[in-house]
Amino acid sequence: MKKFQTMGELIAYMVGANAPNELKAEAENQMQAVEEVNQGGATAYLIIAESKAEAKQVENEYALSNCAPEYSRIINTLDGAYWKQSVFVFSDDGGGIIYFERVPLLP
């Protein structure tokens, strides 16, 4: 699981991971919201889970099985991967996570 609070951290990761352009663009766009929330005094993260094990870690750490996302959608990338983007808000001040989870392809 990768957890980011700044655009610089995210960009460094995306370049090193050779992430698909579609994921980069959406994650960078969402990172702006994370930075705004953090500047306002709340705590927010952008989280990327690339495997089932990382997804399970995020689910356990944030008790995601006990809450529903405010927003969720699937991002298709040109390399054939699917990413599920979900937004979870945990507090009235906007604190929460924007979560990107790699969705395994069906056999």
Residues of each region from the PLM?
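Short, extreme N-terminal segment that most often corresponds to the first beta-strand
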Residues: 2-16, 35, 104
